[in-house]
Amino acid sequence: MALWGGRFSQESSALFKLFNDSLPVDFRLIEQDIVGSIAWASAITQVGILTEQECKDLHHALNELLAETIDNPQLIIASGAEDIHSFVEQSLIAKVGDLGKKLHTGRSRNDQVATDLKLWCKKEGEQLLGLLANLRAALIELAERELDAVMPGYTHLQRAQPVVFGHWCLAYVEMFERDISRLQDALKRADTCPLGTGALAGTAYPMDRVKLAKSLGFASPTLNSLDTVSDRDHVIEICSDASISMMHLSRMAEDLIFFNSGEAGFIDLDDEVTSGSSLMPQKKNPDALELIRGKTGRVYGSLMGILTTMKALPLAYNKDMQEDKEGLFDVMDSWSICLEMAALVLSGLKVNREKTLSAAKQGYANSTELADYLVAKGMPFREAHHVVGEAVVSAIAKQTPLEDLTLEELQAFSAVIDADVYDCLTIESCLAKREALGGTSLPQVKSALAVKQAS
């Protein structure tokens, strides 16, 4: 039976019920709905709606229902209830009779679902923070394991300057630390309790909403009933945070897919995160990484979906807002599995150091060092840049690295070049000079790694 049937003289059509019911999606809120109902029973007891014994009976029945359903979603879905709130109330009435009909006194499904959703976001958000921390730890472990492996750094997907692999790992540590900070901030803003604000104008009962909020683990109650039941900022913000984090995951996946390609051959991926081809027996495909990259799109889609749903809604609750959950649940599921999979990929990754070093020595990645050498000799940088560009053109024509040009050939571009030029053109010199804070010199990377390991 629907919770709102008294106003209507005929049953809803089967098509409308199928269209309107949200239980196949919001059954996931069972724990939060029951926990919120337990708190509400205590709150209405304190204002005289229930006796202490009635409150105890409701608490017992609600806890019993939670034990029956927490690991049995099919039991919930098979009930045919309109939504998770209807399921809980109908199940409660079946257990305690008319006493169950008292529980909804002073409460609306509007503040109820807002409370459920915030409780769910808080719980799942904490789990996501743990997964982000695990991925951060996996990157730090990989950075330590492959710290000094020399590889080319890229701009425009062209070899630019040499870096060490540990520096690459720590770049992504920075990104995922920002993701952690963003999610922490979002959860802090979500830590206000909607319960007790009613349908839109507040409850008619003199609730201690501060006490109610604390009983549910919130920092404080919300302060405006109209805003409270209209608000889905926490859903949007978490989906936004997930989208940014998935972008970071996708970029990391793209790097690793390229590093693993036959054209690069910089890394080997473990068999447990790759698959083969049904036709080509030689193939070992980076499917885990490609799926991370692919799932990023569906997370973006969910963010755009909730933004579009909310963009023109008048205050307060509108049924459009029922569409907030499916996308949110999918975002959190996708984000979670991608974080877990990324950590697994990193745990078995091996760097082919000979190939990365060989690649770092190609592509004239030491050109900037030659320009800096000329600057040290007193030449203005812009002029040095031009001179080195001419030297690179000459080296390309001769199909030789810069460091293999003779001194006479180099001096043809500038008379200030001397025999000491070759010292600055080595890979070791290129790396060692990047010693300012944040650079890729080995001492700097070791120092940065130590900071991350200690925090």
From Swiss-Prot:
GO terms, molecular function: argininosuccinate lyase activity
From the Swiss-Prot or TrEMBL record, give the protein name. Answer: Argininosuccinate lyase
* One Pfam family from the record: ASL_C2
Q: Would the keyword Lyase turn up in this protein's UniProt record?
A: yes
Q: Which PANTHER family match?
A: ARGININOSUCCINATE LYASE
Q: Which reaction does it catalyse?
A: 2-(N(omega)-L-arginino)succinate = fumarate + L-arginine
Q: Which PROSITE patterns match?
A: FUMARATE_LYASES
Where the protein is mainly located, per its record?
A: cytoplasm
Q: What is its EC number?
A: 4.3.2.1
